[in-house]
């Protein structure tokens, strides 16, 4: 428990009265952890949400759809056999050759693996082209809601992961240490926190919330989202064995929570992030399984940190802002699954202002890929992006990433085990998974 005191009182600030019992893996000295100033304040009234690996509530749980509740605090009172939530962080280097993507989840979807409901998904591309895919299960998960920040700790006897987000959501930090791998990510936001429908959080002074039948946090049926950091400046430091990597570039942080597993609520999705010149791009296009094959949209475009475009419409309109999404096949990098697109063209169209922005995402390198058979599966790319406002002399270049996913109509548990249960195989998982998929 000594390390716990050090972690809570040192790295994550004193929690004078919060009862945080996290007696797991010590964080050690963490010489690699970046130092940063944290605002002073009263830390005697922190709320603690704690789950153990196999803890599951019986029956319904509290499931928040509130647009006024702070985006970072837990949206579920606990988890039952279906609901889940995630804190996601990502970074891409200025060169476009290095990347890190991490997701901290409380999710019972794959409890049949027998490893519990708490996991950290970890995807990394090193500058030398090395790709790393990790799925780690932990023994405990604790989220600490304090007046100045929200902190999370996913922890086991031999590995630890942690994050901290300032309450104004302008800064985020992530740390991890698995013995073989350790690292940190620091994000300084350049954008405004917002909800799935583009509503700024909190509302600007004098602005009142419009009552809607569709919750502001709803991304698609059963799936909910907020984006505390749609884009920001990133520094990351990673050590894997004797290899080290430092990234200076761009990144983001999202919150997701859902009423059931990805396989039950979605048939697939497209996600795109982009950072070029004064622009930050965020585009989500889930394909609903609950509302058969209907695509839903959440498109946000920032310029100089200000939200200049937001829409949940994906078809041309004369009345409301909308987005257009097209596949491109003229490039050199594609996935090995059925979708052979080498990039996407994304347009943001505003009839009310007469403005259109067009951005071409060209796949630069593959970040990860996992197949489910029949050409379906998940592929992530590092992208090179070119674009700007149409009809002007704007033509900026930058970096980003994208995901393309198509899930099978039916999926057996052993197939999920191959793809998502790779953590069950420990350090041999990539070798075994690649072997299985090569003969599938």
From Swiss-Prot:
Keywords, alphabetical? Glycoprotein, Isomerase, Signal
Give the signal peptide as a residue range, or say none if absent: 1-18
**Record-given protein name:** Diels-Alderase mycB
- UniProt gene name: mycB
User: Which pathway does this polypeptide act in?
Assistant: Mycotoxin biosynthesis
What is seen without this gene?
Completely abolishes the production of myceliothermophin E, but leads to the accumulation of its C18 keto acyclic precursor.
Q: Could you tell me the EC number(s) of this protein?
A: 5.5.1.-
The keyword Signal belongs to this UniProt entry's keyword annotation = yes
Q: Which GO terms describe its molecular function?
A: isomerase activity
Top-level division of the source organism's lineage: Eukaryota
Catalytic activity from the UniProt record: (5S)-5-(2-methylpropyl)-3-[(2E,6R,8E,10E,12E)-6,8,10,12-tetramethyltetradeca-2,8,10,12-tetraenoyl]-2,5-dihydro-1H-pyrrol-2-one = (5S)-3-[(1S,2R,4aR,6R,8aS)-2-(but-2-en-2-yl)-3,4a,6-trimethyl-1,2,4a,5,6,7,8,8a-octahydronaphthalene-1-carbonyl]-5-(2-methylpropyl)-2,5-dihydro-1H-pyrrol-2-one; (5Z)-5-(2-methylpropylidene)-3-[(2E,6R,8E,10E,12E)-6,8,10,12-tetramethyltetradeca-2,8,10,12-tetraenoyl]-2,5-dihydro-1H-pyrrol-2-one = myceliothermophin E
Identify its protein family. Answer: Belongs to the Diels-Alderase family.
């Amino acid at each position: 428990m000594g390390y716990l005191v050090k972690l809570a009182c040192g790295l994550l600030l004193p929690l004078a009265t919060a009862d945080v019992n996290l007696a797991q893996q010590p964080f050690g000295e963490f010489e690699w952890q970046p130092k940063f100033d944290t605002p002073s304040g009263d830390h005697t009234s922190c709320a603690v949400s704690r789950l153990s690996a196999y803890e599951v509530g019986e029956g319904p749980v509290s499931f928040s759809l509130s647009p006024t509740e702070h985006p970072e605090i837990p949206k579920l009172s606990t988890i039952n056999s279906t609901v889940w939530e995630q804190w996601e962080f990502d970074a891409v280097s200025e060169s476009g050759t290095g990347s890190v993507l991490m997701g901290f989840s409380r999710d019972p979807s794959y409890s049949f693996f027998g490893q519990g409901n708490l996991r950290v998904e970890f995807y990394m591309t090193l500058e030398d082209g090395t790709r790393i895919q990790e799925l780690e299960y932990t023994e405990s998960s604790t989220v600490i809601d304090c007046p100045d920040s929200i902190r999370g700790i996913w922890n086991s006897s031999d590995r630890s992961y942690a994050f901290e987000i300032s309450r104004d959501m302008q800064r985020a930090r992530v740390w991890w240490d698995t013995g073989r791998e350790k690292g940190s990510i620091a994000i300084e936001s350049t954008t405004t926190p917002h909800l799935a429908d583009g509503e700024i959080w909190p509302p600007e002074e004098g602005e009142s919330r419009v009552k809607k039948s569709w919750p502001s946090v709803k991304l698609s049926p059963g799936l909910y989202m907020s984006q505390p950091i749609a884009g920001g400046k990133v520094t990351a430091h990673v050590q894997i064995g004797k290899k080290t990597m430092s990234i200076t570039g761009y990144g983001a942080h999202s919150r997701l929570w859902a009423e059931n597993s990805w396989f039950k609520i979605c048939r697939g999705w497209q996600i795109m992030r982009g950072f070029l010149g004064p622009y930050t791009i965020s585009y989500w296009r889930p394909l609903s399984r609950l509302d058969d094959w209907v695509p839903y949209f959440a498109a946000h475009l920032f310029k100089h940190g200000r939200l200049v475009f937001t829409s949940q419409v994906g078809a041309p309109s004369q009345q409301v802002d909308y987005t257009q999404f097209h596949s491109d096949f003229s490039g050199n990098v594609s996935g090995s699954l059925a979708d052979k697109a080498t990039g996407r063209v994304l347009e943001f169209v505003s009839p009310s202002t007469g403005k259109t922005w067009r951005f071409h995402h060209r796949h630069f390198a593959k970040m990860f890929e996992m197949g489910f058979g029949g050409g379906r599966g998940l592929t992530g790319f590092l992208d090179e992006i070119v674009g700007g406002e149409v009809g002007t002399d704007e033509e900026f270049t930058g970096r980003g990433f994208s995901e393309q996913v198509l899930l099978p109509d039916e999926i057996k548990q052993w197939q999920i085990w191959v793809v998502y249960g790779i953590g069950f195989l420990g350090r041999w998982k990539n070798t075994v998974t690649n072997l299985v998929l090569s003969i599938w």
